[in-house]
Amino acid sequence: MSQFVLPAVASEGIINWPFLTGFMLGQFSVGLVLLIFVRFFIFSDQTEPDINTQRRTAKVLPTGNPSTDAILEKTYYNTKTHQPESLDWFSVLVAQALYQLRDEVRGNDEVLERLNEILKSDKLPGFLDTINVVDLDIGDAFPQFGACKVNKDESGDLEAEIKVSLEDTIKLGVETKMLLNFPIPKFASVPVSLSVSLVKFSGTLTVAIRSAFNSGEANRVLVSFAPDYELQWKIESSVGSTQKLQNAEKISRLIESRIRRWFKDRCVYPEYQQFELPKLWRKTSAPPPSAGAGTGTSTGVPPSPFPQPANPSSVPKPLELPGGFPHRNMSMSSQRPNINNPKFIRSMSVNTRPTYSSSFYEMQGTAGSSSGSAVADEAYRSLQTSPRR
């Protein structure tokens, strides 16, 4: 049996300490490795962000506004040497859209009605009556776009300049009355007919996109015309009913100056028209509170589809027969209960004489009849004389 003795113990009983020490250190190192593996690979905390993910996010989502020089460099566009481009394809697209619009407007009286509603305003001067649109012609020619070129403005932002020209006859005819409010309101009136036609327009259209980086505002498209535009009008007027004043030059100049001022104050640089671009990614908002919040209807129980009475006490109760016997369909049935039924007679107390009120007979249409009282008395006497079981 001595050959099966552990090598750590010598035959003389002396312990081999170097071997035992190495064996214990090996077991301890294996346990330590297993503990580290379980702690940091199996039960590791996943709340800390990954550094590599942050680096990838920083590369995908730039934080600053890309400079115009970088955009021009990556699109191989030089604002100084690049030649103006033709926009014939864009002119064709606009022509198709205008053709569809004109096809819908022609022969549609709703357009004139809509224009009349717009012109019916309380802001009209007191010497003018209601303005009615009597003629509308949106022309048959199409605008031409060309000579497009991208430049830098004074602040360094990019903007596109496009030449626009249109030669057509776009006509709007209206009728109204000039009122004389002295000595009383509408003391006299003079009919006035006016026709305004756009004959020619040419100018330089400027289009710019203003981005709103790192702000809650939406991106905008700014549209304006250069001050060196050309605008030609044809104005026809008629004043009076019997003796008419045709095409007064003073009236034509007055109307044309008003139209030019209106256009300049809204569409000519430095003034502009702006349009917001829709956002591709919108922030999700919290759902609105339920309509029944605070009223007891948001508990998950659906409301009854049937109308509920405002006062529950006003609901009619089922009628009761004399002696406390309810009749289920008494409120809906027109049949009178059979008092001579043996089951009905046996169910009544022997020592109690039923009392039939007048309302019971009123409901059945026999109020105050002697036949009903006679039947009740006969039933009571039969109960008194019948032997008890």
Swiss-Prot record:
The chain crosses the membrane at residues 23-43. Keywords: Endoplasmic reticulum, Lipid transport, Lipid-binding, Membrane, Transmembrane, Transmembrane helix, Transport. The keyword Ion transport does not apply. Residues 283-345, 360-389 are annotated as: Disordered. One of its GO terms (cellular component) is endoplasmic reticulum membrane. It is found in: Endoplasmic reticulum membrane. GO terms for biological process: aminophospholipid transport; intermembrane lipid transfer; mitochondrial genome maintenance; mitochondrion-endoplasmic reticulum membrane tethering; protein insertion into mitochondrial outer membrane. Residues 44-389 are cytoplasmic. Pfam families: MMM1. The keyword Endoplasmic reticulum applies. GO terms for molecular function: lipid binding. It is a single-pass type I membrane protein. Residues 83-278 form the SMP-LTD domain. Residues 330-341 have a biased composition (Polar residues). Residues 1-22 are lumenal. It comes from the Eukaryota. Homodimer. Component of the ER-mitochondria encounter structure (ERMES) or MDM complex, composed of MMM1, MDM10, MDM12 and MDM34. A MMM1 homodimer associates with one molecule of MDM12 on each side in a pairwise head-to-tail manner, and the SMP-LTD domains of MMM1 and MDM12 generate a continuous hydrophobic tunnel for phospholipid trafficking. The SMP-LTD domain is a barrel-like domain that can bind various types of glycerophospholipids in its interior and mediate their transfer between two adjacent bilayers. Belongs to the MMM1 family. Component of the ERMES/MDM complex, which serves as a molecular tether to connect the endoplasmic reticulum (ER) and mitochondria. Components of this complex are involved in the control of mitochondrial shape and protein biogenesis, and function in nonvesicular lipid trafficking between the ER and mitochondria. The MDM12-MMM11 subcomplex functions in the major beta-barrel assembly pathway that is responsible for biogenesis of all outer membrane beta-barrel proteins, and acts in a late step after the SAM complex. This is Maintenance of mitochondrial morphology protein 1-1. It comes from Yarrowia lipolytica (strain CLIB 122 / E 150) (Yeast). The lineage of its organism: Eukaryota, Fungi, Dikarya, Ascomycota, Saccharomycotina.
